[in-house]
Structures are given as C-alpha cells and as structure tokens.
C-alpha cells in the first residue's frame, strides 16, 4: 500500500422532497459565468414525479454484457445457449459435460417490452489468414495445428440514424495453448444487425508482426453527426473519419479527463481549464486539434448529451443533474433514491436518456444466498397528483453509506405509509471547503430546520446535538420493540455510545479501531500509557518507530484526539479538559513525528506494517477489525503473536474504540417518530445485518457470521467423501486470499477458537466510540501547530486549546 493510500485510509478511519417517484428540482445552483461558477447542491420540489418500471429479461439471457441507447431503442449484448455441448475430465477422472454459449445482440423495445435478436449480426470476422481464427497451420514439429477463435464485444455505443457501434476483439488459439492472430475491430451495424462498415483501430496498424497475439482495450466509443468516430483507451483518444481512415489522436499530458459528448456534434473531454474550472474541451476533426471550451459544473467528471431543456447531464452522489439551457443553472433532475431505485445497482456506462424524457438503465442486484439478477429499468415522468402520497421523513447525512442506501430503497418500496427522503449535505462541498455541507446543516438546525432522522458516518457532531436536546433516546424504542430487545443486540458498542445512560444513536454495524503489537514486545503491561509505549519502544533496535515512519504530526494528532475525545470533552455538562497533564503528554508524544515526510530523501523500498513489526522496526500498527477475515489474516501475518493493545491512554482504560459505517438518530422534532423507528428497526433485520461488510450489531447475525467463519470446509470427491493428503489428513479449502504491501499472499481458512476469543476480548474491553467533531479537531490542530513547530511551550499550547474549545462549546449551547 502506498503512503498516499495509507494516509487516505487513516483519514477514513478518523473521520470515521418527493412522492412515490423522483421530483423535479428548483434551479438554484451553478452560475453561468465560469469565473463565478459555484456548485451548491439544489433543493428539490415535488412538481413532477418519476415512476420506475422494471422489465425482466427473457429466460435464455444469462447476462447482459454491454449496452447502449440509440434513438429510442436499447441495444445490449448477452450470452445465450447455442445448443452445443462441450466435455472435460475433472480431477477424479470423471467426464463432465456443459452447455456452450454464444454472444448475441438484442434490440429491446422500450414501449412494448419486446426483446428481439439481431439475426443479421455475424458474430465473428471473416478471416483470410490461415494462422488466424479457425485456421489451420503446421507446427514446428510438422504436426497440424487447428486454431479456434473466441470473439467478445467489449463496448458499444450509439451511432447516427439509429445505428450502433461495437468494439470487438477476436483471439485465436490452438488446443495446446499456442496463440494465433488477434483481431480488433470497430464495426457499425444497422437496427437489424447488418454490417455497415468496419474500422481497424490504429494500434493494429502499428502492431509488431513478430507478436501476433495482441490485446487491445477500448473503454469508450463515441460518434458525431458528421460520421466521425472517437475511441478512448485511458491513454489515447483516436479519431476516425466517415470513410474509416485515421484522422488524428491526442494522448499523454493532453488528456486529463474522460472522453464524453456534449451534443450530437460535439465530442471531447472533461478537463480543468487554466483557471482551475471544469470545462468541456471539444475535439475538432477539421483542425485536428482542440476546439472550443465550454464551462461545466465542477462536479461533472463525465457528461451526457442533453435534450430540449438541459445542455448536458451528469451524475453525482446517486443523482442525475443537468444544466438548464435557459438559465445556465445546474439542478437535480432525478434522484435515484427518491425513485426507489438503488443507484448502487446501476453502472454509469449502462444507462441513458430518451428524447421523450424517459431514462433507461440496466440494473444488477445480488442476494445474500449468492444469487443475482439483472433487469431493465425505465423511469417515466408522471403527474405528481396521480401518485399515492406517503408520510415523508427527511434523513440528513454527510455522504450516504453504500449499504444504508440499499436499505432505504428496500424500506421505501415495502412501506405503504412512509418514505425516507435523503438530503445528502456532502453535495454542498466546494473545492475550497469540503465541510461546507456540515456548516450548512448546523446552520439549518440552529435556525430550527431540523431533519427527522440523521445518518452519521462519524463526521457529524452527534454528541453536540444530543446536548442541545435535539435527539431522542433510543433505548425506550428498543425496550418497547417486540423483536429487537437489548439482549438481541451487541451491547458493548451501544453502551460505549451512551451518554448518561441514554442512547442517542444506533449503529447499523461496528468495527474496532485499534493498534496491533507483537506479544513478545507488548505483553506484560497492566496499563498502556504513553510511558508504557516508550518503555516498549526501548526494547526494539535503535531507530525503531512507534507507528509507520510515514505518519506526520498532523495525522497522529488527529488520530490520538479522535481516540481519546471522551477523556477531554463532555458535551452534556459543557466542559473540556485540555489544560491537563494528560493532554500535554499526548502533545509531547506527537511532537517527535515529522511535520512532513521527506519523500525525496527516502530511498528505502516500501515495507508493510506487518513486515516492519516482525523486523523490529515498528512497535504498533494502527488498524481496524471489521470482520473475521481481518482477524484471521492479522494472526496469520504476525505468526499468531498479534496483540490488540490499542492506542495509549493516560486514564488507564483500553486504547481501542468502536467505529461504524453509519449510526442512526431520531430527532425530538421528528414528524412521525413511529415511522422513523420503523425505518431504523428495518436495519436490524437479519438478512440486512448478515450482508454487511463490518461486524453486525444484531447478535444473532454476529453469531451466525462467527459460526460460518469458524467452520472449515474440506475437499471431497464426487461421492462427498473427504480427500486426504499424503499424511492422511483432510485437505482444508481456502475461502480466499489477502495480501498487503510486500507481504506474501495468505490463504484464509477457518477462524480458530483462540482467534475468536481474542476478538471477543477486544470487544468486551472496549468502552469508547471514535468521536470526531471536525471543528474541535481544527482548533486543536491550529493551536498545537505552534508547539509542534517549537514556537510555543506545551503549557502555552494546551491553555490556548482549552480556552478556544471552551468558548466553542459555550457558543454551541
């Protein structure tokens, strides 16, 4: 893992109005003047509603590969049984047969739902080279070699007049593995699959004749109304003329965005202009160079052609936005979530816009039993008055958790009475202020505009809201629930979230933020204070560091404060304790870390934290336990000598803290608290809990996951009997493998009882929750900077921090 990725992980650990359809929003965003362009997220109204209609695929279609919309028709590729059979001999010597499949193109009528195969499409190219597809040649030993071919359509795109473009690759190979010719083609088909023209990608023209096996990849194909074709492979944009000839290309430093289309006549890339604003930069085939630049939203990394109302569309945070032609304002056009559609199930390359305003997408959903299905979704605008209204409950968040988004969709679809309407304040972030949305939310709450529910991703000041009396105690709801009583939940994470015995937020899942050390170094300490850490460090060779050498003062300060927040702040009584020996000791602990890591002078090869621990170069590894797979890997990587000692704390308590992907709150002003609890309790359903990546908060799901993780499967023969190794022992089956950095791949097997007991001991001993109030962290970082730079004493810094945080607390009352 690189330092930048590692730093990102550190930050993540730390910072750890509609009817039944989508609404049409007001126009109050981007300024048309590029110099004054802003990107505040739009508010929504219920002037229009979009209603989803799903179409199931025909039974013989196993999987949609790639798709596009040309005109008002959806085209897609799929693998279907072709009536053939193949056989192979398995490891036991038994002959096994299976059906063969062919790749087919379908045309889907979005008005009738009729799905038609393009019978005129020829699935393989005509190959004259006998060494190529389905050819025959002589091997070096004089034997005859028969080459078979495999053709795959990698991507497709709309063309002019209802046609479609495909990029397909055909590879040939002999039974002995000898590689034949590889053929790449851009082909244009009419609505029935008849071949109109073929273009050979420019890479093939320059292919090394001694290397006949080539794999060309094209991510994007676009065409304009003059017949020019544009391709993009993440490195180069190539442009071809109406006659198929190569025109020009752009690559390297000239490309810093995504190939996309603004209109039928304008193809180009999204890029940053000289003044740092986002623009659409047109490719001009006539001049063979860049053409005009059009200002676009700073959130529009990939755009789609507009219609009679909008200049272009783009997606952001699970919604579709558009820039209005009449005002130049960017507004939210469709909120997938408000349409009861989970945007997690839709790929950006598998949806499009029809001329009549409908939106079409291919959806993918998986189930907990391992099954999956695809459907075709059509969103049609409807009169809002015709939609049966429900009680709407506003849920505020700052970035919506992936799994929670799916659960909201499920709840909204199934509930006859309630609808959760999400307002994601991360949409208000600007290039200059990432936390602008949090500021807006706090301002609205202070002014009395309080949401019904809050979903916290460890970045919102929940304890502050609770101290203001804005949040409901959730224990009475749990105690009164007929199914989810306290003893049905993992109580330790909940108890750590309590304030004076009240539970103001309920986590949907949990993990444990901790620091790992080797038992041979960190065992034997009754406490784990800063002095204990320094004592343990003295046991290691000279030059060893407490944590990874890349961590800076700023990173470690935020880490330590977030892990120790409950030791220094009490929102309920409005006090803080930064002018203390304990906090000064924390500052002194942070000071030896570098202000900035000197990458230029570092010539050493990267070593993972696990390697540094085992080599005596590092005392502790900050990480989080999220699942039993994490647990198994940690023990295996450290030769079963892992100890979860956590971060140093001066009060003698454990240095571990719980975290969660999302915690849920009900506000005291909620318009329907029974409905709000109905939604929260839906996140406790066993199917949802068992699908989470983190540890479930539902005890039965946690225990079921533990049982599954501790159950070892073994290799068996066709009769179900265990296969034994040379020593007469059954052969365990790995559930997968994990590798970090320079560490070798470690196969994952069943968690042992000892490992299970270790994680339970960590959970049972943890008493705090990672608490991040970004405003407090900013104050501490600002005032600690002088001490860390040597211009202030630790006493001066702690007094300034105490004064400013105290004032901040009083201001928030």
Language-model-derived ranges and their functions:
Residues 475-488, 566-587, 646-657, 790:
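Short, solvent-exposed loop/beta-turn-alpha elements that line the ligand-binding surface or hinge
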Residues 588, 593-678, 700, 704:
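Extracytoplasmic/periplasmic substrate-binding proteins
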Residues 542, 681-711:
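Periplasmic-binding protein-like
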Residues 109, 190-192, 196, 498-604, ...:
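Helix-loop-helix "hinge/cap" segment bordering the ligand-binding cleft or interdomain interface
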Residues 23-26, 30-106, 110-115, 156, ...:
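Conserved N-terminal structural module of periplasmic/extracytoplasmic solute-binding proteins
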Residues 419-489, 498, 612-620, 636-637:
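Extracytoplasmic "Venus flytrap"/periplasmic binding protein-like
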Residues 459-514, 526-532, 642-648:
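Hinge/lid segment of periplasmic solute-binding proteins
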Residues 726-805:
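C-terminal capping/gating helix-and-loop segments adjacent to ligand/active sites or protein-protein/ligand interfaces
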């Amino acid at each position: 893992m690189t330092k930048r990725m590692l730093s990102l992980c550190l930050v993540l650990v730390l910072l750890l109005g509609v009817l039944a359809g989508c609404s049409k929003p007001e126009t109050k965003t981007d300024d048309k003047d590029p110099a004054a362009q802003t990107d505040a997220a739009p508010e929504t109204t219920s002037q229009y509603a979009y209603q989803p209609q799903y179409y199931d695929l025909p039974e013989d279609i196993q999987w949609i590969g790639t798709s596009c919309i040309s005109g008002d028709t959806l085209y897609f590729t799929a693998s279907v049984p072709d009536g053939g059979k193949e056989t192979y001999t398995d490891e036991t010597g038994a002959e096994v047969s299976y059906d063969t499949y062919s790749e087919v193109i379908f045309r889907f009528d979005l008005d009738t739902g009729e799905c038609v195969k393009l019978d005129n499409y020829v699935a393989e190219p005509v190959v004259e080279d006998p060494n190529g597809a389905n050819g025959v040649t002589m091997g070096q030993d004089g034997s005859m070699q028969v080459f078979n071919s495999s053709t795959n359509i990698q991507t497709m795109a709309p063309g002019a007049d209802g046609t479609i473009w495909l990029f397909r690759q055909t590879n040939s190979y002999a039974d002995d593995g000898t590689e034949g010719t590889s053929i790449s083609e851009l082909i244009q088909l009419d609505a029935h699959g008849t071949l109109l023209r073929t273009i050979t990608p420019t890479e093939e023209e320059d292919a090394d004749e001694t290397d006949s096996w080539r794999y060309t990849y094209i991510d994007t194909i676009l065409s304009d109304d003059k017949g020019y074709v544009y391709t993009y492979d993440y490195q180069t944009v190539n442009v071809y003329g109406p006659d198929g000839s190569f025109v020009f290309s752009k690559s390297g430093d000239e490309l810093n965005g995504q190939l996309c289309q603004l209109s039928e006549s304008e193809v180009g890339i999204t890029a940053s202009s000289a003044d740092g604003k986002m623009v659409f930069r047109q490719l001009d085939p006539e001049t063979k160079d860049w053409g005009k630049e059009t200002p676009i939203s700073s959130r529009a990394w990939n755009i789609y052609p507009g219609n009679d109302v909008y200049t272009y569309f783009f997606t952001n945070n699970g919604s579709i936005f558009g820039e209005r032609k009449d005002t130049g304002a960017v507004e939210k056009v469709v909120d997938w979530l408000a349409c009861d559609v989970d945007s997690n199930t839709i790929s950006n390359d598998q949806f499009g816009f029809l001329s009549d305003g409908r939106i079409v997408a291919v959806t993918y959903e998986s189930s907990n039993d391992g099954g999956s299905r695809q459907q075709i979704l059509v969103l049609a605008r409807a009169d809002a008055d015709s939609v049966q209204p429900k009680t709407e409950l506003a849920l505020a968040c700052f970035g919506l958790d992936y799994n929670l988004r799916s659960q909201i969709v499920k709840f909204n679809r199934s509930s006859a009475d309630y609808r959760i309407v999400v307002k994601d304040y991360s949409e208000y972030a600007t290039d200059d202020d990432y936390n602008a949305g949090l500021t807006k939310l706090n301002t609205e709450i202070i002014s009395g505009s309080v949401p019904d529910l809050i979903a916290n991703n460890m970045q919102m000041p929940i304890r502050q809201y609770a101290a203001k009396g804005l949040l409901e105690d959730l224990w009475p709801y749990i105690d009164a629930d007929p199914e989810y009583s306290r003893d049905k939940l993992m109580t330790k994470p909940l108890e750590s979230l309590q304030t004076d015995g009240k539970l103001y937020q309920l986590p949907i899942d949990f993990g444990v933020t901790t620091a790992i050390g080797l038992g041979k170094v960190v065992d034997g300490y009754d406490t784990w204070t800063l002095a204990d850490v320094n004592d343990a460090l003295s046991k290691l060779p000279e030059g060893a560091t407490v944590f990874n050498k890349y961590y800076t003062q700023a990173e470690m300060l935020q880490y330590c404060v977030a892990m120790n927040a409950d030791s220094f702040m009490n929102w309920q009584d409005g006090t803080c304790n930064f002018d203390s020996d304990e906090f000064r000791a924390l500052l002194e602990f942070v000071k030896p870390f570098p202000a900035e890591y000197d990458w230029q002078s570092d010539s050493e090869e990267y070593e993972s934290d696990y390697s540094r621990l085992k080599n005596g170069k590092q005392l502790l590894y900050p990480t989080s336990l999220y699942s039993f797979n994490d647990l198994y890997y940690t023990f295996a990587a450290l030769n079963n000598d892992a100890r979860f000692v956590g971060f140093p704390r001066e009060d003698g308590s454990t240095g571990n803290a719980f975290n969660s992907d999302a915690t849920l709150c009900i506000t005291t002003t909620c318009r329907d608290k029974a409905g709000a609890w109905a939604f929260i309790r839906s996140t406790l359903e066993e199917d949802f809990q068992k699908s989470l990546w983190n540890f479930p908060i539902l005890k039965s799901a946690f225990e079921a996951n533990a049982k599954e993780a501790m159950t070892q499967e073994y290799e068996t023969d066709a009769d179900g009997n265990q296969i034994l190794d040379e020593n007469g022992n059954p052969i365990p089956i790995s559930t997968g493998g994990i590798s970090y950095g320079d560490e070798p791949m470690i196969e994952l097997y069943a968690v042992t009882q000892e490992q299970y007991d270790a994680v339970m001991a960590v959970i049972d001993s943890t008493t705090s929750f990672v608490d991040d109030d970004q405003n407090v962290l900013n104050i501490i970082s600002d005032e600690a900077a002088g001490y860390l730079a040597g211009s202030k004493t630790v006493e001066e810094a702690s007094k300034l921090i105490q004064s400013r945080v105290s004032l901040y607390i009083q201001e928030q009352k």
